């Protein structure tokens, strides 16, 4: 899920209390008719050694097409893009959709590698994948963890990022800002992060991963009538043996409760300065973003050609809930560069 301080830092503390209904532990809207996905799988899947990982990824489109890398979030997987990929492939793009570390068929190459979920580690995985696939430059797009990783790639490696599509805007984690408390209603919205901070939370997530993540799906997208088959296709990725360790570390690291690795210290120092994103970019917001929906608060952090789009009636999983709109953003921003 997104940065716990987004609503207060970006939209003001007073407004933050109303912004978190989508991720609060009790949903206020329950869809009555499940909506099946248009597609259920990808053209093909592959594996490649890349950096610290053996990365599993879905692919579509011509091998010589302009590359687009689509990054999923938590608790989701590559199937968030199952309807986006063929739309982009039909326009001639080479589409790569990797399972992030801790998801699906992606595995650590060494048992001794720390199961790190910090932002610099996940973003560096993207660069390693591009190197392994001999992709010098790509359009990078994502939501949730994937948007954060895409933002980091665009900010720290602009020479590798042709253009950017980021749901919820500028999501680079600010560890210092994360130390400050939010108003009670806003804190309530981030209940799962505090749950993960406890031994009980880690044990509970390990024991109930399937049902826990389905609850997050429902609460983050209260008007999306996904069916069980749609959820179960993604839920298979949560059985990855490293999934719980990576997820728990990610959220504890964000709260300053778990250290990152020294190898990423320089990257994190650069990210702490909130570097501007200079590449062409389209940001997308949805109902999940609450008072930050207009994107005004992070507009100054995008200094290249830029557009912000608002999708009303859509929850957090934008590419799966609104695949045409997401694909259109990728197609348009690619044309700017």
Language-model regions: role of each:
Residues 1, 22-51:
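C-terminal segment of N-terminal export signals and the immediately downstream linker at the start
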Residues 36-43, 52-55, 60, 67, ...:
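Flexible "cap/lid" subdomain of the alpha/beta-hydrolase fold that forms the substrate-access gate
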Residues 26, 73, 144, 320-321:
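Conserved acidic functional residues
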Residues 1-15:
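N-terminal secretory signal peptides and thylakoid transit peptides that target proteins
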Residues 76, 172, 290-291, 316-319:
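Nucleotide-sugar-dependent glycosyltransferase donor-binding/catalytic pocket residues
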Residues 60-107:
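Conserved HGGG/HGGXW glycine-rich cap/lid loop of the alpha/beta-hydrolase fold
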Residues 82, 151-155, 327:
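Short, hydrophobic alpha-helix immediately C-terminal to the catalytic nucleophile
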Residues 307-337:
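Catalytic active-site module of serine/aspartate enzymes centered on a nucleophile-bearing elbow/loop
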